[in-house]
A protein has these predicted regions:
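Cytosolic regulatory regions built on CNB/CRP/Popeye-like sensor folds
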Residues: 1-115
Length: 115
């Protein structure tokens, strides 16, 4: 677990913003965070025990939404290269499965937000 570092965020603090380079995967250990659209509207909450930034592991790119701490929050954070290496060391098949799930999620989001 030496590739992980603990980061703390105060309620209202942005963890990442729309358009930022996607370079890390976050595991939310305490608190909750919310996804915020480019217009500033919160549209989803991620609770304690969940993760965010999974797309960074596989494809990098830029953040499609901002993430803001809804409450004080503590995350375990790992860089996307380290996370990918860790994932591959467990099973290369997991990478293929995750890529498929991310594609499905992207398609569902495109349909949802095109209406």
């Amino acid at each position: 677990m030496s590739d992980f570092k603990t980061e703390r965020f105060e309620a209202g603090q942005f963890i990442c913003k729309v358009g930022d380079q996607a370079t890390h995967l976050y595991f939310l250990q305490q608190g909750s965070v919310e996804l915020v659209s480019a217009s500033g509207d919160a549209f989803a909450v991620i609770p304690e025990g969940q993760s965010f930034g999974e797309a960074a592991i596989l494809k990098g790119g830029i953040r499609a939404a901002s993430i803001r701490a809804k409450t004080d929050a503590v995350c375990e954070v790992i860089g996307n290269e380290q996370a990918r290496d860790l994932l591959i060391s467990y099973s290369p098949l997991l990478v293929v499965i995750m890529e498929g799930l991310l594609l499905q999620q992207a398609m569902a989001n495109a349909i949802k937000y095109s209406k």
